[in-house]
């Protein structure tokens, strides 16, 4: 029996000696490699925080002392140590273990969101609450890093944390130089410089001792050298970052040396005020394929071989992902248009811009985990005569809504937002679903929003989007492979007709308006209507927003209109169409199918859609049921 088999709670860590702790760390890494290889998940980040997490649980008393994990994907080791080891075979699967902290799973989990840079604000609020309620014996610890320090919210929180000199709060910086890919920007350079600081300090300590033996001459010499040293130091470390914020700074500490980390954390715990513990770690540590993966050190994987790290996913011959279709076509557009530039928020690989950057490196900008800055920076590029394309996950656009509204739309600027992972993403859970973008973008004045149904219409949508130079445009698509071509039986100026057929008895004319990726469900429902003797037509609008006048007029002659979307049904595309029909005086009953107004549990995309009644069979049955009530 290994050490890990004996650990079911943080209390089991307290009595382990140094050798046992080292063995435990090795066993946890092997456990992670075996389990995450079989299920997929965030392997690289968790291999890098094994010792950090063990030390945090040994020094602090969770759950009495909240441990907050920024971005959440660094929490696997925390889950292992808090009694959830036996659930890892179900990681990110329906009704299984969440890939992020989950308050329903354990009292040790204080937060749930997978969005970066929020942990310090949570921690600040918790520390204030403990102070106000007389629970000053409780400590709050936030593990931040893996790129989250590039987010502005982190620095807003640090500014507030530093103002309370006697409030106990420990910020552990996991400095692995990465988010998905290598962390960029001045902050990353400063953290790298801070790693050098002990070298300067050791050299100066040695010099001071040697010169001190020379009496007053030596003292004067040291003062001169010290002045030179400070000048050099401040060149390498321009603002000393954390100390100049008024925060006690400890480090850098080897994040894989348990003794060093524990000593630093114990000092921070007893300090009596806010403390930064700067640790240096290696993402993917202990798994050679991850360590050698220059792109992202296996930040997130599917099912892989636990020895070689090679993907074990079955590939459909000829299949191409939505992301790849976008990437390839944006390169083609940029080859013809020198004004096209691309922006990513620390996710060049996942959003398809890594390939674009290889072809057009000078026209690609990675701003770090800073979606708000990305959108307003894009506005500046547009003001300068360029057409920026900002590629982000749909869920992360939520953070930049004000910038889209006030910095882009108000100025009538031509900026294109490409929203990957729109709709239901599945295994990453509630905070990764892109089920709000049609609702929030749809209220922006002047905006154009497209939801293509397949690879060809994605290319056409992107062409239309970058042709607009006086308003923001949005192109959204889901996770996964783009379906094989879904042809139109007739193409109109503003919409495509995908299906047009009368039932034998034509008991009623039903129009199905399909917004984007659920077109196959719409077509299945149309065939079911015909089988039930109804007349059915399916249309796919070129623009979800604004609603084309020609589509409204086309809809006038039907007995029932049904809309289908993978967005929140409240305030979504269907409800917008319903409103526009009403305003046009078109009095046709409308039924909207979409995602309910609730946070969704994780599972595969197909499983979640089925639970929501948005699978092909249920959609067909529901639509026929609507028609039968005419």
From Swiss-Prot:
Class of the enzyme per the UniProt entry, highest EC level: transferase
Pathway(s) where this gene product acts: Metabolic intermediate biosynthesis; 1-deoxy-D-xylulose 5-phosphate biosynthesis; 1-deoxy-D-xylulose 5-phosphate from D-glyceraldehyde 3-phosphate and pyruvate: step 1/1
Residues at which Mg(2+) binds: 146, 176
SUPFAM superfamilies, per the entry: Thiamin diphosphate-binding fold (THDP-binding), TK C-terminal domain-like
Catalysis performed (reactions): D-glyceraldehyde 3-phosphate + pyruvate + H(+) = 1-deoxy-D-xylulose 5-phosphate + CO2
Co-factor binding details: Binds 1 Mg(2+) ion per subunit. Binds 1 thiamine pyrophosphate per subunit.
EC assignment: 2.2.1.7
Cofactor(s) demanded: Mg(2+); thiamine diphosphate
Gene3D superfamilies documented for this protein: 3.40.50.920, 3.40.50.970
Recorded superkingdom: Bacteria
Molecular-function annotations in GO: 1-deoxy-D-xylulose-5-phosphate synthase activity; magnesium ion binding; thiamine pyrophosphate binding
Entry GO terms, CC: cytosol
Record keywords, A-Z: Isoprene biosynthesis, Magnesium, Metal-binding, Thiamine biosynthesis, Thiamine pyrophosphate, Transferase
Binding residue positions for thiamine diphosphate: 73, 114-116, 147-148, 176, 287, 371
Gene Ontology biological-process entries: 1-deoxy-D-xylulose 5-phosphate biosynthetic process; isopentenyl diphosphate biosynthetic process, methylerythritol 4-phosphate pathway; terpenoid biosynthetic process; thiamine biosynthetic process
Pfam families, A to Z: DXP_synthase_N (PF13292), Transket_pyr (PF02779), Transketolase_C (PF02780)
InterPro entries: Dxylulose-5-P_synthase, THDP-binding, Transketo_C/PFOR_II, Transketolase-like_Pyr-bd, Transketolase_BS, Transketolase_C, Transketolase_CS
Protein family according to the UniProt entry: Belongs to the transketolase family. DXPS subfamily.
Function: Catalyzes the acyloin condensation reaction between C atoms 2 and 3 of pyruvate and glyceraldehyde 3-phosphate to yield 1-deoxy-D-xylulose-5-phosphate (DXP).
Assembly mode: Homodimer.
HAMAP family documented for this protein: DXP_synth
Name of the protein in its database record: 1-deoxy-D-xylulose-5-phosphate synthase
């Amino acid at each position: 029996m290994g050490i890990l088999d004996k650990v079911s709670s943080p209390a089991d860590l307290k009595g382990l000696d140094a050798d046992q702790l080292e063995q435990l760390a090795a066993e946890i890494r092997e456990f992670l490699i075996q389990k995450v290889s079989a299920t997929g998940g965030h392997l690289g980040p968790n291999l890098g925080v094994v010792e950090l997490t063990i030390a945090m649980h040994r020094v602090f008393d969770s759950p009495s002392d909240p441990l907050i994990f920024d971005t959440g994907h660094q929490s696997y080791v925390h889950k292992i140590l808090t009694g959830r080891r036996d659930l890892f075979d179900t990681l990110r699967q329906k009704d299984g273990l969440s890939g992020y902290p989950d308050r329903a799973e354990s009292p040790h989990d204080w937060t749930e969101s997978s969005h970066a840079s929020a942990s310090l604000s949570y921690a600040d609020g918790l520390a204030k609450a403990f102070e106000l309620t007389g629970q000053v014996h409780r400590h709050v610890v936030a593990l931040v890093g893996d790129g989250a320090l590039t987010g502005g919210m982190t620095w807003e929180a640090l500014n507030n944390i530093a103002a309370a000199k006697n409030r106990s709060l420990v910020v552990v910086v996991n400095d692995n130089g990465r988010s998905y890919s290598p962390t960029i920007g001045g902050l990353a350079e400063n953290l790298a410089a801070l790693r050098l600081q002990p070298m300067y300090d050791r050299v100066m300590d040695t010099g001071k001792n040697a010169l001190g033996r020379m009496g007053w001459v030596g003292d004067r010499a040291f003062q001169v050298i010290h002045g030179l040293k400070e000048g050099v130091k401040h060149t390498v470390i321009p603002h000393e970052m954390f100390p100049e914020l008024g925060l006690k700074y400890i480090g850098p500490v080897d994040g894989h040396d348990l003794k060093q980390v524990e000593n630093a954390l114990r000092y921070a715990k007893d300090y009596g005020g806010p403390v930064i513990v700067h640790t240096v770690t290696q993402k993917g540590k202990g798994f050679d394929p991850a360590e050698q993966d220059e792109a992202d050190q296996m930040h997130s994987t599917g099912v892989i071989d636990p020895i070689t790290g090679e993907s074990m996913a079955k590939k459909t011959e000829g299949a191409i992902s939505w992301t790849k279709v976008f990437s390839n076509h944006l390169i083609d557009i940029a080859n013809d248009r020198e004004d096209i530039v691309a922006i990513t928020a620390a996710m060049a690989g996942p959003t398809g811009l890594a390939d674009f950057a290889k072809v057009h490196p000078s026209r690609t900008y990675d701003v770090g985990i800073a979606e708000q800055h990305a959108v307003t920076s894009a506005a500046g590029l547009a003001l300068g005569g360029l057409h920026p394309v900002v590629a982000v996950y749909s869920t992360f656009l939520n953070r930049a809504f004000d910038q889209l509204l006030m910095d882009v739309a108000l100025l009538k600027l031509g900026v294109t937002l490409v929203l990957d992972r729109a709709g239901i993403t599945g295994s990453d859970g509630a905070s990764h679903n892109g089920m709000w973008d049609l609702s929030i973008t749809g209220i922006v004045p002047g905006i154009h929003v497209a939801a293509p149904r397949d690879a060809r219409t994605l290319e056409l949508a992107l062409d239309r989007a970058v042709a607009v130079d006086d308003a923001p445009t949005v192109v959204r698509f889901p996770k996964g492979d783009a379906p094989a071509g879904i042809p139109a039986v007739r193409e109109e100026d503003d919409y495509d007709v995908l299906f047009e057929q009368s039932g034998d008895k034509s008991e009623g004319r039903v129009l199905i308006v399909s917004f984007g990726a659920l077109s196959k469900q719409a077509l299945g429902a149309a065939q079911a209507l015909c089988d039930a003797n109804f007349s059915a037509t399916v249309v796919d609008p070129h623009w979800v927003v604004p609603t084309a006048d020609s589509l409204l007029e086309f809809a006038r002659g039907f007995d029932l209109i049904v809309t289908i979307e993978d967005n929140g049904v409240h305030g979504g595309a269907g409800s917008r169409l319903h409103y526009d029909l009403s305003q046009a005086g078109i009095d046709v009953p409308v039924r909207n199918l979409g995602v309910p107004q609730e946070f969704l549990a994780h599972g595969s995309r197909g499983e979640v859609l089925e639970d929501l009644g948005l699978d092909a069979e249920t959609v067909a049955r529901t639509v026929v049921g609507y028609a039968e009530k005419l």
